């Protein structure tokens, strides 16, 4: 009648209700039937909704039954459209039956996996740690040292009982002979070396070494002079520092012992150099480094030493100088005590240049008490290295 459509709406054949996609709920529910498993059990029905599926813990016996009902839950409704044709749709009223079936299959598999995982975890036995935590009770063991030392004697069977040991050497005790025979007494003397085989017991050192040999050896030892090098280790002036390094390399290559005196580490060396060169310079003014001396004889500076080395005269001048032994500091080896610095901190004041004298102490030569200047080190609290600067 009027402008309204008089065409009847599609109705469901089962419930005779109108089909409208607007009023269809988004969640679905299903009925799961649980038959009686034991005598006396009742037949009951459980309604499952989409929000509860996945949160229930199922036992292994009802797993297959639940999966079967999930497949049967897709009941189909026949809907007649305006043309009179019937269409099969799923239970929620929409035309997406395949997607909902896939979702339910996935949920069933997830539930089945959870059930199997929980079952496996229950069957796996828990391993208990076998390491003991508490110390077992018991009395401490007593060790008898006398039993362990039994059989060990002070005298070894491989060593004579008359063998004595000193701190630095071994010797054998010789039993005194009660026989007055001279030949037997001589047989107990220490063995002589080959050098003394043909020498009489009454000979003296003067008979072996003539006096002229001893005097020549003493004169040769005392007559050796050292090469004294005055230099600086400061790098403020680059040319001066490089000249000092070059002269040190030239002198060390000759294998002689050098008395290196660093004027930057000890002001006393600077005063010595001024006193030695006051005749060559204007009262020691304008002295440059390095400077080389052979004893008290002045050899020259950097230019003179280079020229003497190139001409071969430097090696002739120092032929009587003391040579450096192999492996000792100065022969290409660094001093282990000072590291080729030639100075070490003072052992008395530890480099502080101060000593404290208490009034109660009665030291010889101490007239004042309190903090005093250390008399053993220089102005920098350093002393000469006792290893390489003997």
UniProtKB/Swiss-Prot annotation:
Disulfide bridge positions per record: none
InterPro entries in the cross-refs: Glutaredoxin (IPR002109), Thioredoxin-like_sf (IPR036249)
Name of this protein: Uncharacterized protein At5g39865
Annotated Glutaredoxin domain residues: 215-325
PANTHER family reported in the protein's UniProt record: GLUTAREDOXIN DOMAIN-CONTAINING CYSTEINE-RICH PROTEIN CG12206-RELATED, OS04G0641300 PROTEIN
């Amino acid at each position: 009648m009027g402008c309204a459509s008089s065409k009847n709406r599609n109705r469901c054949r089962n419930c005779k209700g109108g089909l409208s996609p607007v009023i269809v709920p988004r969640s679905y529910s299903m009925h799961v039937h649980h038959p009686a498993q034991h005598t006396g059990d009742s037949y009951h029905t459980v309604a499952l909704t989409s929000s509860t599926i996945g949160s229930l813990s199922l036992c292994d016996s009802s797993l297959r039954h639940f999966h079967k009902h999930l497949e049967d839950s897709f009941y189909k409704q026949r809907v007649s459209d305006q043309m009179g044709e019937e269409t099969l749709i799923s239970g929620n009223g929409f035309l997406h039956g395949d997607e909902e079936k896939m979702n339910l299959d996935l949920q069933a598999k997830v539930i089945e996996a959870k059930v199997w995982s929980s079952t496996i975890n229950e069957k796996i036995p828990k391993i208990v740690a076998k390491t003991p935590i508490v110390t077992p009770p018991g009395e401490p063991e007593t060790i008898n040292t006398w039993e362990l030392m039994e059989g060990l004697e002070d005298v070894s069977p491989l060593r004579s009982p008359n063998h004595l040991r000193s701190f630095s050497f071994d010797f054998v005790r010789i039993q005194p002979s009660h026989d007055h025979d001279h030949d037997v007494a001589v047989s107990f003397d220490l063995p002589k070396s080959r050098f003394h085989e043909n020498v009489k017991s009454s000979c003296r050192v003067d008979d072996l070494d003539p006096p002229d040999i001893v005097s020549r050896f003493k004169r040769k030892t005392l007559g050796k002079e050292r090469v004294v090098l005055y230099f600086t280790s400061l790098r403020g002036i680059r040319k001066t520092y490089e000249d000092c390094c070059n002269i040190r390399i030239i002198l060390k290559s000759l294998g002689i012992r050098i008395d290196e005196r660093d004027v930057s580490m000890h002001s006393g060396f600077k005063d010595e150099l001024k006193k030695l060169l006051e005749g060559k310079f204007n009262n020691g003014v304008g002295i440059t480094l390095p400077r080389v001396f052979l004893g008290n004889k002045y050899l020259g500076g950097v230019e003179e030493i280079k020229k003497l080395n190139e001409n071969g005269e430097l090696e002739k001048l120092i032929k009587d100088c003391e040579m450096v032994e192999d492996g000792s500091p100065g022969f290409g080896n660094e001093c282990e005590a000072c590291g080729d610095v030639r100075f070490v901190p003072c052992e008395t004041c530890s480099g502080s240049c101060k000593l404290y004298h208490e009034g109660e102490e009665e030291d010889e030569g101490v007239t004042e008490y309190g903090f005093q200047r250390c008399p053993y080190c220089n102005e920098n609290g350093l002393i000469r290295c006792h290893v390489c600067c003997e």
